[in-house]
Amino acid sequence: MEPRTLDLAAYPRRAHFDYFRQMANPYVSVTAPCDITALRRLTQERGLPFFLTVLHCAINAANAVPELRQRIRGEGIVEYDRCLSSHTVALPDGTYCYCTLDCAQSLGAFLPAAQAEVARVKAAPSLDDGADPDELFFVSSLPWLTFSAISLPTPTPADSNPRITFGKFTQEGDRVLLPVNLTANHALVDGPHLAAFFDGMVQRATHPEEYF
């Protein structure tokens, strides 16, 4: 998927782009509890894989925010029509490998294809991000911990791939809450864009049957 190049002369955040690019740590990171009660119920009732169902929800919420599909390339900005996910897959020896998935299909079509791809990469594990790492959302999961903040390793110089991390969900009364972290490069992404991701994820998790 070849991205389009943005016209920086018409880009409304040009000053902010230049400002945050100068910083040693240009990342902004927000963790929020997402209500996944209905989504969790759907996975239980239909016997669906929980992580992959949450992944599909999150990646489609991220793809609905144009700023999260933008990447810094050289001195400019490119924007993808949609981005793929690259998530960690646990291996029997305690390490992990990466698995790249396209979440554009409906949930019902996505899950069997995703399960097959996870099985394939576990048989031949690799940390290769593929031909175009820029088109990826980096996704991790800490199902052992319910966290309220997280710090992630990032490269130098800074990249511009958003990072999404899930924690251990908790039951609070009749609600199921999942801690979700979104880390993004502030040269491209501001507070309203972060909020749009979380709003989109909760909306999808509240009505998961609409995306099946």
Residues of each region from the PLM?
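Flexible helix-coil linker/hinge segments at domain or subdomain boundaries
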Residues: R204-F212
